[in-house]
Structures are given as structure tokens and as C-alpha cells.
């Protein structure tokens, strides 16, 4: 069984090989998001921001505003807590074409403590006009979703729940 996050990033890499406008942005999470192969194979389409989620969202908005198809990827808890204002203003209100991939929602990162829990992501993001939210149920649905998202012109939050199959 393939985990949703692996399906997501494998499909994104496959599409990015053919479309130079696809860019992956991450925040020191290439391991947890499984973006290692993407970074190695397409370094010109990969942006590593370090532990700076607010900056990653701002950079993603700027790239999208210039015509790129941006996927900003990392733990769900940090995109909905640490960078909430940037998601609201730079993505939802501004309708920038950025897809947020939030991995390990809920209490999936349980051992890392409450700072890594994401219990409010869907509730909070539902209040933002123009923000779309999707939770694919398995790898097959995730693959189909990525193919649709590449050409979908609005901001989308994709929540992938944790599974132990990398």
C-alpha cells in the first residue's frame, strides 16, 4: 500500500518533469513530505525555506503571482498556526494559485507534543473566503487529485493524514 504523501509527491514529480511552471516549496520537511527525489531531480523547481513557514507562504504567493503552479508542503500544524495570517491574506484573499500540502493532520505527530498537533486546520481554513479544502482518502484518490490541482486556479489546502507506509 502506498501512503497518500508518497503518492502526492511522486505524482507531482511526474507532472513537474513535463511542466517547468510547477514548483515545490518546503520548510525543512522534505523527509516528512517525501520530496527528496523532487529536490534532487528538479532543483530549479524546488525551494527550501528552512523552518520559516510564513516566508514559505509569502514566497509561494509571489511565485504564483508570477505564473508558477506552486505546491507548498510541510506539517499541517505549521501552515495553519504559524503562518495563518499569510495563508489568509496572501493566498485566500488574494486568490493566489498555491496549493498547501499539510501532512500529518490531527494528532499524528503525537510523540512530538501539542505544538505538532493540528486539530483546528479544517475548521479555521473553512472561514476563509476562496480557500478550498480537500482530504483524499487513499493513494489512488491522491494521485487523481494532484493531476487536477496542477491546473486548478485557486488556493487549495490538501490535508493528508499520516500513515506508516512511507
Label the model's feature ranges:
Residues 1-161:
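Thiamine diphosphate
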Residues 162-166:
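Conserved small/polar residues in nucleotide/adenosyl-binding loops
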Amino acid at each position: 500500500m502506498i501512503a497518500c504523501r508518497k503518492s502526492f509527491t511522486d505524482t507531482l514529480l511526474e507532472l513537474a518533469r513535463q511542466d517547468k511552471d510547477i514548483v515545490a516549496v518546503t520548510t525543512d520537511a522534505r523527509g516528512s513530505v517525501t520530496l527528496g527525489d523532487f529536490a534532487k531531480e528538479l532543483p530549479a523547481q524546488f525551494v527550501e525555506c528552512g523552518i520559516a513557514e510564513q516566508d514559505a507562504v509569502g514566497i509561494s504567493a509571489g511565485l504564483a503571482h508570477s505564473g508558477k503552479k506552486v505546491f507548498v508542503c510541510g506539517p499541517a500544524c505549521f501552515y495553519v498556526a504559524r503562518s495563518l495570517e499569510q495563508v489568509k491574506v496572501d493566498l485566500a484573499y488574494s486568490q493566489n494559485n498555491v496549493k498547501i500540502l499539510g501532512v500529518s493532520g490531527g494528532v499524528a505527530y503525537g510523540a512530538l507534543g501539542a505544538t505538532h498537533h493540528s486539530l483546528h486546520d479544517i475548521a479555521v481554513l473553512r472561514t476563509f473566503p476562496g480557500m478550498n479544502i480537500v482530504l483524499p482518502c487513499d493513494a489512488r484518490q491522491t494521485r487523481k487529485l494532484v493531476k487536477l490541482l496542477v491546473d486548478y486556479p485557486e488556493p487549495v489546502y490538501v490535508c493528508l493524514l499520516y500513515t506508516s507506509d512511507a
